């Protein structure tokens, strides 16, 4: 049964007159037009046409507690009464920083910024400034934000819409960015051997959540840690997605691999804009005002985002991680079983509360294989799920997430929808 989306269509036509492409981020667009949200609560989105969707996109990751969490709203309302921006330090910045340091293994000091993009840009600047080297290694398909250093062979919306290399970025900017396949130890060794004493850092998503959900091969992250230490190269974990999601201390706690620097975002802001660079004290103290490496921002440490972050992290206990991982595994297992039952070529990957399906008969271990997935079949799967009241990201090059509000009743409804969708998907 087709969705009623008349009001969304009308709003999209109006939006196109004033907003580029009718949206403010490419990942929000899908053909023929996206639904427009009126409100959200727990694990549900409600659109302007009165449709209700179980949400597995969760704003592309941040809403681990579900939407409109009572404790977060209460804390933010109280802070709003006290002011929304000061341009001065606050005690709450210290409180959240201490919580981050307590949880994240590599974090001895913190610098709050406003987005994951800002965090990775500043982390790379820090690595270059500390080492005095220019070159960086990034992995094909990894998305580390929308800045020029790393927007080459990118994932996320850049891959979804067919522009992994953005025009407008001079070759001079990216000539020091070395691109190699994920999960390939030999490629890392070759890149380092060919650029001896020139590489400042390797930046990596421990889970490639912007090309779907590509997992590191066993021992791969440990290998990156060892080879960077051997060659005096800094290792940066981009944990904008995995931070506080895989475990209290993120991927570095989950895998037991501690980088030199990490970037955080999404969950850290409890639904409000935020980012953070964290790392060893001797590295972090090279940022201004203590050091010469400049990093600043009008809204760094914004009290609204900081308050929401404190209220969010307080609720991420052991039960949270156990439950969100349990429900994600159930859904991933269901997708595998349905693909097998209906003889559909598909691979499903899951870790903690992250999962995704690729319509592909090969094991998806890197960007090149992910690109070979059947996007037409995925969009058929996406629309059929949407018609059944289940919203997943509109691209298999994004990741699905569970929140603490995805309880057994919600999961059962989702499984029923998935079963219906796979009938005739061949």
Curated annotation (Swiss-Prot):
Its main location: cytoplasm. Its EC number is 5.4.3.8. Pathway: Porphyrin-containing compound metabolism; protoporphyrin-IX biosynthesis; 5-aminolevulinate from L-glutamyl-tRNA(Glu): step 2/2. It is an enzyme of class 5 (isomerase). It comes from the Archaea. It is found in: Cytoplasm. Pfam families: Aminotran_3 (PF00202). NCBIfam families: hemL, PRK00062.1. Belongs to the class-III pyridoxal-phosphate-dependent aminotransferase family. HemL subfamily. This is Glutamate-1-semialdehyde 2,1-aminomutase. It comes from Methanocaldococcus jannaschii (strain ATCC 43067 / DSM 2661 / JAL-1 / JCM 10045 / NBRC 100440) (Methanococcus jannaschii).
């Amino acid at each position: 049964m087709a969705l009623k989306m008349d009001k969304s269509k009308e709003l999209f036509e109006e939006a196109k007159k004033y907003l580029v492409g009718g949206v403010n981020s490419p990942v929000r667009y899908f053909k023929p037009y996206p639904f427009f949200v009126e409100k959200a609560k727990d694990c549900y989105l409600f659109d302007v046409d009165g449709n209700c969707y179980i949400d597995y996109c969760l704003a592309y990751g941040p809403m681990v507690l579900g939407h409109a969490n009572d404790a977060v709203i209460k804390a933010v309302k109280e802070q709003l009464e006290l002011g929304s921006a000061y341009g001065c330090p606050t005690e709450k910045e210290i409180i959240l920083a201490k919580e981050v340091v307590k949880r994240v293994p590599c974090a001895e000091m913190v610098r709050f910024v406003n987005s994951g993009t800002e965090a990775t840009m500043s982390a790379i600047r820090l690595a270059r400034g500390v080492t005095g080297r220019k070159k960086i290694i990034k992995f094909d398909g990894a998305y580390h934000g929308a800045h020029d250093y790393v927007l080459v062979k990118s994932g996320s919306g850049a891959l979804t819409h067919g522009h992994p290399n953005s025009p407008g970025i001079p070759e001079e900017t990216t000539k020091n960015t070395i691109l190699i396949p994920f999960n390939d130890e030999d490629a890392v060794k070759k890149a380092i051997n060919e650029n001896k004493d020139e590489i400042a850092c390797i930046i990596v998503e421990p889970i490639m959540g912007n090309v779907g959900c590509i997992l590191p091969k066993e021992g791969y992250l440990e290998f990156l840690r060892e080879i960077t230490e051997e060659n005096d190269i800094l290792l940066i974990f981009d944990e904008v997605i995995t931070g506080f999601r895989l475990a209290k201390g993120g991927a570095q706690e989950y895998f037991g691999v501690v980088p030199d620097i990490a970037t955080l975002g999404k969950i850290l802001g409890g639904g409000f804009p935020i980012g953070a660079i964290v790392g060893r004290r001797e590295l972090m103290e090279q940022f201004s005002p203590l050091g010469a490496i400049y990093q600043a921002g009008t809204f760094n440490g914004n009290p609204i985002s900081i308050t929401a972050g404190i209220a969010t992290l307080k609720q991420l206990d052991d039960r949270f991680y156990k439950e969100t991982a349990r429900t994600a595994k159930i859904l991933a297992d269901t997708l595998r079983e349905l693909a097998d039952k209906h003889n559909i070529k598909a691979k499903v990957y899951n870790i903690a509360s992250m999962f995704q399906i690729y319509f592909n008969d090969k094991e998806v271990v890197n960007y090149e294989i992910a690109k070979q997935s059947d996007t037409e079949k995925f969009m058929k799967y996406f629309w059929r799920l949407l018609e059944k009241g289940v919203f997943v990201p509109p691209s298999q090059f994004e990741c699905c997430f569970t929140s603490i509000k995805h309880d057994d009743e919600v999961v059962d409804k989702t499984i029923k929808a998935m079963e219906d969708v796979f009938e005739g998907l061949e």
